[in-house]
Amino acid sequence: MSKGKIIVAMSGGVDSAVTAGLLMEDGYEVIGVNLRTWEYEAPACDTTKKSCCSPEDIRDARDVGISLKIPFYVIKMEKVFQEKVIDRFIEDYQHGKTPNPCVECNTFVKFGALFEKAKALGIDKIATGHYARIARNGERYAIANGIDVGKNQAYYLYGLSQENLKNVIFPLGEMTKPEVRQIARRMGLPVADKSESQEICFIPENDYRKFLEKKNVEFTPGFFKLKDGRIVGKHKGRENFTIGQRKGLGIAWKNPLYVISIEDDGSVILGEENETYNESFSVIDLNFQGLAPLNEGESLECRVQVRYRHIPIRCKITKMKEGLIVHPLEDVRGVTPGQSAVFYPLDSDYLLLGGIISKGSIQMRIVEPAISVLN
């Protein structure tokens, strides 16, 4: 007996292809959908590179649909992608932040807009090839880490709503990448050995500066300064820098210097390694998953992850009128405005909540310089 219809977001890669195949084997009536998010003929896009969502990927997704004998459609998402991902990406850099477009894409395009399309077709369920799982904490749903540590994508999925989480399936959450490729070969899928994308889909070669230039973004020149206000050089645009950056500064100093703050007036503040640790920071634009929303003034000890490959550390969070104040209980450095922070329980691997690290909330503290490795 059929388990009903389900839409599978098919990127053209092996993960989404296996997702579709597994759901078919499990009794679902699978409809494959590819989300066209970017005008690939645009001069900013070099389709010869390994970026996701290219015309080649659309062809590969269609070939998988033919191989599995399922309906396949391409849905135009350029407008919502432009508004929710690209425009915000540009705006964040113009305000001295370092954005994470993959988070916005997952929240507003891959899930938000796709669920709207599914409901318009009378379909409740969607599935993707993310390496993540769904957990329950009482009455609340949450993203939980996939078992493949190297591929775990929970960090990018904190923006999913409770309604999204009730109706999404992640068949690969309990698998490793080698297992997925083995299944693809068993199914005879044409993308079984296809290499993975290595770039942001609209940023060829990950050269965001070139992308901003092609979008006619005006860079904000200014001075390199130390924390005490001393000017140690000039730069051609704060958009060229990110928190924690060491290379490419062009400043001769007795010790290596790092970017520790990017100011509204265009100043880029530099400090030595022992000035890069974070005493506290704030997080805004919160989305609660496994944790019910906190009331203003409530506090909680948990763990925080401040970038994709960061190992979560213990912290104390306090709910403020707008957002959270986070006090790390272990050393952390390079906390970057515009990036996302996600929070886990002390003893479990599901997401409590997540949000955007806010500009203007970074306070530096002096620690022993022996600690020199970015988590």
UniProtKB/Swiss-Prot annotation:
EC annotation from Swiss-Prot or TrEMBL: 2.8.1.13
Known catalytic reactions: S-sulfanyl-L-cysteinyl-[protein] + uridine(34) in tRNA + AH2 + ATP = 2-thiouridine(34) in tRNA + L-cysteinyl-[protein] + A + AMP + diphosphate + H(+)
Chief place of localization: cytoplasm
One MF annotation (Gene Ontology) recorded for this entry: tRNA-uridine 2-sulfurtransferase activity
Matches recorded under InterPro entries: MnmA-like, MnmA-like_C, MnmA-like_central, MnmA-like_central_sf, Rossmann-like_a/b/a_fold
Active-site positions on this chain: C105, C201
Keywords: ATP-binding, Cytoplasm, Disulfide bond, Nucleotide-binding, RNA-binding, Transferase, tRNA processing, tRNA-binding
An example Gene Ontology biological process: tRNA wobble position uridine thiolation
EC top class named in words: transferase
Region span, Interaction with tRNA: 151-153, 307-308
Protein's cellular compartments: Cytoplasm
A Pfam family recorded for this sequence: tRNA_Me_trans_M
CDD domains listed in its UniProt record: MnmA_TRMU-like
Disulfide-bonded cysteines: C105-C201
Binding, ATP: A9, M10, S11, G12, G13, V14, D15, S16, L35, G129
RNA-binding found in the keyword field: yes
Swiss-Prot/TrEMBL site (Interaction with tRNA) positions: H130, Q339
GO CC annotations on file: cytoplasm
Role: Catalyzes the 2-thiolation of uridine at the wobble position (U34) of tRNA, leading to the formation of s(2)U34.
Entry-linked HAMAP family: tRNA_thiouridyl_MnmA
Family under the similarity heading: Belongs to the MnmA/TRMU family.
Record's protein name: tRNA-specific 2-thiouridylase MnmA
Organism: Leptospira interrogans serogroup Icterohaemorrhagiae serovar Lai (strain 56601)
Gene: mnmA
